[in-house]
């Protein structure tokens, strides 16, 4: 469950995100999995409250999972890598507060107007790059409990819109509001140092792939409806 859904129902969010993660570790313990790779989030950096970045229930749950993983390793020798993806974009990334750049690309492909409700520097982590990082991680042999940031490319929302409009000059996509309340420029190097040099996508490559995918689905009559709510 992502940020808005955890905010709407914190108890359910905790059951899904925290208890659900514990269940994964318990199953690993029972059947003897060699390692676990799980998704944390950059939202965990909002803890403890009162710091530079926004605190959320979702971030609390993700930080709890990171500490849970450390204890499973210390007490039961279950190795794990927790990956904190920053702002993932690409086909089907259509829910959560950080999905708005994907929705903007979809809106352009479907000839719809859309205003991204934030601006400024932003992490652009293409879904293909995020998937590669997880695949490389689960293929790596290791014995400890690690947590790594996964940032992708740091670029402004405004420049992302410019790339989109180079593909479709008549696109009715804008941005407004404040800067996004999470760090846009974390380092991927510690993760790459452990697991190897997984594929990287530039912002331009990711936007082009995403836009063309939405266009293809539109032509096939299979493009999902635009989610302008959550």
Language-model-detected regions and their locations in the chain:
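Conserved active-site region of classical short-chain dehydrogenase/reductase
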Residues: 18-26, 67, 131, 135
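Active-site beta-alpha turn of Rossmann-fold NAD(P)-dependent dehydrogenases/reductases
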Residues: 37-41, 84-86, 151
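C-terminal substrate-binding subdomain of Rossmann-fold SDR/epimerase-dehydratase oxidoreductases
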Residues: 117-120, 124-230
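NAD(P)-dependent short-chain dehydrogenase/reductase
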Residues: 57, 70-122, 129
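NAD(P)H-binding glycine-rich loop region in Rossmannoid oxidoreductase-like domains
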Residues: 1-16
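Active-site segment of SDR-like NAD(P)-dependent oxidoreductases
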Residues: 1-4, 42-49, 86-89
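Conserved Rossmann-fold NAD(P)-dependent oxidoreductase catalytic core, especially the SDR/UDP-sugar
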Residues: 15, 19-59
């Amino acid at each position: 469950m992502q940020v808005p859904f955890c905010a709407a129902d914190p108890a359910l969010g905790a059951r899904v995100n925290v208890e659900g993660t514990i269940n994964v570790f318990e199953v690993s313990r029972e059947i003897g999995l060699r390692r676990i790779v799980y998704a944390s989030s950059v939202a965990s950096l909002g803890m403890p409250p009162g710091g530079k970045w926004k605190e959320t229930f979702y971030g609390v749950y993700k930080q709890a999972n990171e500490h849970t993983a450390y204890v499973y390793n210390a007490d039961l020798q279950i190795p794990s890598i927790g990956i904190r993806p920053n702002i993932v974009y690409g086909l089907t990334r259509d829910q959560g507060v950080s999905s708005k750049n994907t929705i903007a690309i979809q809106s352009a492909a479907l000839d719809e107007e859309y205003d991204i409700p934030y601006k400024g520097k932003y992490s652009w982590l293409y879904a293909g790059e995020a998937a590669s990082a997880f695949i490389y991680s689960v293929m790596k042999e290791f014995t400890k409990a690690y947590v790594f940031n996964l940032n992708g490319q740091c670029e402004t929302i405004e420049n992302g819109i410019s790339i989109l409009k180079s593909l479709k000059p008549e696109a009715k996509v804008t941005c407004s509001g404040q800067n996004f309340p999470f760090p846009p420029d974390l380092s991927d190097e510690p993760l790459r140092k452990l697991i190897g040099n997984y594929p990287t996508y530039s912002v331009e490559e990711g936007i082009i792939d995403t836009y063309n995918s939405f266009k293809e689905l539109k032509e096939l009559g299979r493009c999902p409806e635009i989610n302008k709510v959550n």
